[in-house]
């Protein structure tokens, strides 16, 4: 279960970088795009991946959840069509659940025997409703795991003005959702996307333009 621990953004980035370093040491080759998140989850952390029907409340979309004691990431097979039509979504959700495993799961409880007659409930459901701090932290971990600085920075170092075609190019290279790329670049202070979807160099530039209208 979640320990409700506070994580600084730089701590989350460091934890993601450490996990990538462990994987690099294990396989003995340099990291390259896209980050092999399935192999990392299965071979390094020993998480298994399962597809089955997951219950959803009205007006709710549940994509996946984590069963820590069973070391399972369970994807909702009812949302298979959504995964198929959304580039990068499967990898994004899987890395998000890896983030929960690394940040929030008490590893001391993983190998404990379950209570007889009681099935383990899924935790940390990736759902469409309001996001908790645990969810936000897992998502930030995912963004640094799948879009690490050493692989991102050389691609954007000489870019002066970002546009959507370039962002979609990055999406395809890193194989994440387009929102991951957008938020990743926004957090680096390289752009700001307004409610209409227009890209600005910064939020300050957008606010200045808005005041002039």
List the predicted regions and their residue ranges.
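Active-site hotspot residues in diverse enzymes, especially metal/ion-binding acidic/histidine motifs
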Residues: 1-213
């Amino acid at each position: 279960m979640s320990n409700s621990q506070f994580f600084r953004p730089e701590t989350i980035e460091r934890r993601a970088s450490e996990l990538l370093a462990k994987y690099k040491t294990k396989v003995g080759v340099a990291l390259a795009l896209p980050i092999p998140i399935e192999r990392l989850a299965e071979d390094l952390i020993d998480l298994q991946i399962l597809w089955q029907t997951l219950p959803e409340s009205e007006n709710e979309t549940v994509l996946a959840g984590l069963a820590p004691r069973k070391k399972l990431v369970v994807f909702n097979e009812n949302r298979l069509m959504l995964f198929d039509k959304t580039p990068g979504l499967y990898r994004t959700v899987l890395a998000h659940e890896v983030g929960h495993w690394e940040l929030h799961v008490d590893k001391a409880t993983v190998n404990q025997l379950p209570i007889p007659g009681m099935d383990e409930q899924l935790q940390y459901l990736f759902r469409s409703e309001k996001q908790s701090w645990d969810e936000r932290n897992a998502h930030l971990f995912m963004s640094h795991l799948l879009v690490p600085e050493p692989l991102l920075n050389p691609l954007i170092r000489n870019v002066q003005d970002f546009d959507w075609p370039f962002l979609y190019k990055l999406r395809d290279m890193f194989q994440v959702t387009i929102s991951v790329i957008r938020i990743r670049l926004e957090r680096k202070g390289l752009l700001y996307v307004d409610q209409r979807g227009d890209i600005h160099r910064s939020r300050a530039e957008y606010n200045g333009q808005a005041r002039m209208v």
